[in-house]
A protein has these predicted regions:
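Acidic, mature catalytic/reactive cores of soluble proteins
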Residues: 1-140
Length: 140
């Protein structure tokens, strides 16, 4: 007779320390969350990049990278972070005639000033159109 379904029976490697690995991953994730104007607004691209090149913007919140982060935070009922991310993103949306509606590739707060990147200094020179394409996915 087949055994009854249970979460314990579904584990592939019961002695793999999976719970410890997940707990450690959550600790690292929490360290990536940064504040904008006193409230957590998103996750940086990397805690520390090996090159430590100040010209790179790994310490910024990338819109594209934060869509799955925000979906995860929604599943964790951390709505305040998602709301802050959406609010900041909307506030930074371009209003100039040629680029109206385009979202920044990334943003960060430096010395109390919110700085947005519309592709000028982003890693790999990602265009802001890329960030704008991810917006409907999160809003859906």
């Amino acid at each position: 007779m087949p055994t009854r379904f249970s979460q314990q029976n579904q584990r592939v490697r019961p002695n793999s320390n999976e719970d410890k690995v997940v707990a450690r991953a959550k600790e690292h994730f929490e360290k990536t969350l940064i504040e904008i104007s006193g409230d957590i607004a998103g996750s940086v691209a990397a805690l520390e990049h090996p090159t430590k090149n100040d010209a790179l913007n790994y310490g910024e919140i990338f819109l594209r990278d934060n869509v799955p982060v925000m979906i995860y935070l929604l599943t964790q009922k951390r709505y305040d972070i998602v709301k802050k991310f959406l609010t900041v993103s909307l506030d930074l949306q371009s209003t100039t005639y040629q680029t109206r509606g385009v979202f920044p590739t990334s943003f960060v707060e430096e010395k109390g000033t919110l700085i947005a990147d519309y592709g000028q200094r982003s890693i790999g020179r990602i265009t802001s159109a890329d960030a704008s394409l991810w917006w409907p996915i999160l809003c859906w």
